[in-house]
């Protein structure tokens, strides 16, 4: 993958499995990706293709019967697959890495612009001013 840009998040050969009724279900098979600083990465796929499961691996939100069976996830030099405690994940989840879930009742407000909602999250988690990030949020909205 890319070596000449600032890689924020790197996932290599991720395999996610779930224990279901005395069987092992493989939900993610060998996914690799890189998130580059200043760029937007979109996960696109059919319902049930594993988008939400993959993003849950980046935030430590897999269900109790799930696990990362193979691969590595590096966030700015930190091995996320080595994190085990809820306290460790609290330092990452929401503050550094966040997910907008598909459930329309818990994700985006249909009466607000996407840009204003992205700005709200940036202000809450990064403590930046609204004016500074309004431009960045608009850029993100245009790229969706």
Please state what every model-predicted region is:
Residues 1-135:
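ABC transporter nucleotide-binding domains
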Residues 133-144:
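Single conserved hydrophobic/aromatic residue that forms the stacking wall/gate
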């Amino acid at each position: 993958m890319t070596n000449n840009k600032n890689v924020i998040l790197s996932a290599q050969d991720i395999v996610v499995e779930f224990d279901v009724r005395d069987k092992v279900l493989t939900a993610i098979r060998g996914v690799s990706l890189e998130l580059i600083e200043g760029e937007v990465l979109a996960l696109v796929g059919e319902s049930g293709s594993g988008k939400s499961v993959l993003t849950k691996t980046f935030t430590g939100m897999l269900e109790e019967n799930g696990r990362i069976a193979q691969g590595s996830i590096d966030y700015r030099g930190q091995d996320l697959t080595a994190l085990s405690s809820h306290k460790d994940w609290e330092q990452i989840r929401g503050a550094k890495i966040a997910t907008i879930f598909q459930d329309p009742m818990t994700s985006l407000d249909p009466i607000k612009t996407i840009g204003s909602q992205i700005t709200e999250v940036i202000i809450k988690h990064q403590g930046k001013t609204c004016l500074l990030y309004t431009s960045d949020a608009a850029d993100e909205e245009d790229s969706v």
